[in-house]
């Protein structure tokens, strides 16, 4: 009898891509396994539509994509902001139940598990109705997962974790070798209006799962992974990464060709690449400071500059209609020989290009893994979610990044921040990132981690073997 896994990713690009690419990996490693991915639709544009279309136009054998029916946005638009994503799946429970029910009645296939995004862990209730074991996918790193479990434990012990907000406290967290400053804690965990109680309930449910699968690898986060394994109250941990979409996200191939063609004309390791994720937009005054810092640094650059979503709209904006309206007067003319300002960027292809020598990043976990895979050192500019923590880990724990700002925080929903990073600091850190010293410790560590990341995914590598053990658990 053939085995079937059901995957349920959250409808955001950083969550969906990782799970779909993981499904492809599972299928490639086990010939008797099929995967069905259930994709929920979110009322806002989360950058997944083009990727979703590419899955349907370029099907993978034994991988089935099921788009769940769209539901009325009013079902969750009025929810507290921390509960918006989890509430998406609440509106889909009937559909998910019907799908699982039909699949479990098949005489030719056995449903061996449901792999749910951490945000969708409450779907476990439906899986339990059919005696289907639930596995959890953590789209962020092991360090973050350990922190979340630690804060949840403190919360269970009646400690008010919101007291850490805006404090100078340094926390001793089992998944970090260094004390963690309160200023880098994800705001969603320490903000009373951010729904920390609800989020901790999700991590509480995670402890009931069969296992937790993390997109990381032993050599990158050995301390964090070991701490999770040592905790008897946490399910078995399987690091199976880095799992990346190396073929792009289905965006415009013509634009990609122009961008890569420009990079072809640049000297090796000479270009600093600036990209801040799908929601990585800035107010005009900050854009001008970045531009001045770039120009003063004297380095070649490729800058992915994207506007925020206009008020009242839900669609992501890929580029500005007129760059001269947002950039300093004359900037484009003065830098035309050394720089290129674009909208959307084919990030993995850019990072993998030999002309790119540094990456100014928002430190989303997928971007972190991509920079490691490509061996490109990072200057950290975290903005929301767990990105401040990722930046801290990259700079202090792993030594593979330089710090521009670790605690720069942006309101994910209002997209405003009164704090400005000045051109002088941007100039200084870009110069530090791009300095032409072959023995640079950061550059050396990144190159070593690049080799380790690839070895981890190769036969008998740490992630390769971890996935083999996971198959033993599942099958």
Swiss-Prot record:
CDD domains: GT1_Gtf-like. Keywords: Glycosyltransferase, Isoprene biosynthesis, Transferase. An anthocyanidin binds at residues 15, 385. Changing residue 144 to F: Normal ability to transfer a glucose residue to the C20-OH of protopanaxatriol (PPT) and gained weak ability to transfer a glucose residue to the C6-OH; thus producing both ginsenosides F1 and Rh1. Gene3D superfamilies: Glycogen Phosphorylase B (3.40.50.2000). Mostly expressed in leaves and flowers, and, to a lower extent, in roots and stems. Pathway: Secondary metabolite biosynthesis; terpenoid biosynthesis. It is an enzyme of class 2 (transferase). GO terms for biological process: terpenoid biosynthetic process. GO terms for molecular function: UDP-glucosyltransferase activity. It comes from the Eukaryota. InterPro entries: UDP-glycosyltransf_plant, UDP_glucos_trans, UDP_glycos_trans_CS. The record marks 144 as: Essential for the glycosylation activity toward the C20-OH of protopanaxatriol (PPT). Changing residue 85 to L: Normal ability to transfer a glucose residue to the C20-OH of protopanaxatriol (PPT). Component of the dammarane-type triterpene saponins (e.g. ginsenosides or panaxosides) biosynthetic pathway. Glycosyltransferase that catalyzes the biosynthesis of ginsenoside F1 from protopanaxatriol (PPT). Triggers C20-OH glycosylation of ginsenoside Rg3 to produce ginsenoside Rd. Mediates the conversion of protopanaxadiol (PPD) to the ginsenoside compound K. catalyzes the production of 20S-O-beta-(D-glucosyl)-dammarenediol II form dammarenediol II (DM). This is UDP-glycosyltransferase 1.
């Amino acid at each position: 009898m053939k085995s079937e896994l059901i995957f349920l990713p959250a409808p955001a690009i950083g969550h969906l891509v990782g799970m779909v690419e993981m499904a492809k990996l599972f299928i490639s490693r086990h010939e008797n396994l099929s995967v069905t991915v259930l994709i929920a639709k979110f009322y806002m544009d989360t950058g997944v539509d083009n990727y979703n279309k590419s899955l349907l136009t370029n099907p993978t054998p034994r991988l089935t994509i099921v788009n769940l029916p769209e539901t009325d946005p009013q079902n969750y638009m009025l929810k507290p902001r921390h509960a918006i994503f989890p509430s998406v799946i609440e509106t889909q429970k009937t559909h998910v139940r019907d799908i699982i029910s039909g699949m479990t009645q098949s005489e030719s296939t056995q449903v061996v598990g449901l792999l749910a995004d951490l945000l969708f862990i409450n779907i476990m209730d439906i899986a339990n109705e059919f005696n289907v074991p639930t596995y959890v996918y953590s789209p962020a790193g092991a360090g973050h997962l350990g922190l979340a479990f630690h804060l949840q434990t403190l919360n269970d012990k009646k400690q008010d974790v919101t007291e850490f907000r805006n404090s100078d406290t340094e926390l001793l967290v089992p998944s970090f070798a260094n004390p963690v400053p309160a200023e880098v804690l994800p705001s969603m965990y320490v903000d009373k209006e951010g729904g920390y109680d609800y989020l901790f309930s999700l991590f509480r449910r995670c402890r009931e799962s069969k296992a937790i699968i993390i997109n990381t690898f032993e050599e990158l986060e050995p301390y964090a992974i070991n701490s999770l394994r040592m905790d008897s109250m946490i399910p078995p941990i399987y690091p199976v990464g880095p799992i990346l979409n190396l073929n792009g996200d289905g965006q415009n191939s013509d634009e990609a060709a122009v961008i890569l063609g420009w990079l072809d004309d640049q000297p090796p390791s000479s270009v600093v690449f600036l990209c801040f994720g799908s929601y990585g937009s800035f107010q005009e005054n900050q854009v001008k400071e970045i531009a001045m810092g770039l120009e003063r640094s004297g380095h070649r650059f490729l800058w992915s500059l994207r506007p925020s979503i206009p008020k009242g709209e839900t669609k992501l904006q890929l580029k500005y209609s007129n760059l001269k309206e947002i950039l300093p007067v004359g900037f484009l003319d003065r830098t035309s020989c050394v720089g290129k300002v674009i909208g959307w960027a084919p990030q993995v292809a850019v990072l993998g290009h030999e002309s790119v020598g540094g990456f100014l990043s928002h430190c989303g976990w997928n971007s972190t893994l991509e920079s490691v895979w490509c061996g490109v050192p990072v200057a950290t500019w975290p903005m929301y979610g767990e990105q401040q923590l990722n930046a801290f880990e990259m700079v202090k724990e792993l030594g593979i990044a330089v710090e521009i700002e670790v605690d720069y925080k942006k309101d994910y929903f209002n997209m405003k921040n009164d704090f400005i990073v000045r051109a002088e600091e941007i100039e200084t850190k870009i110069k530090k990132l791009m300095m032409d010293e072959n023995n640079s410790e950061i550059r050396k560590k990144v190159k070593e981690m690049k080799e380790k990341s690839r070895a981890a995914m190769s036969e008998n590598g740490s992630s390769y073997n971890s996935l083999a053990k996971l198959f033993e658990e599942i099958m």
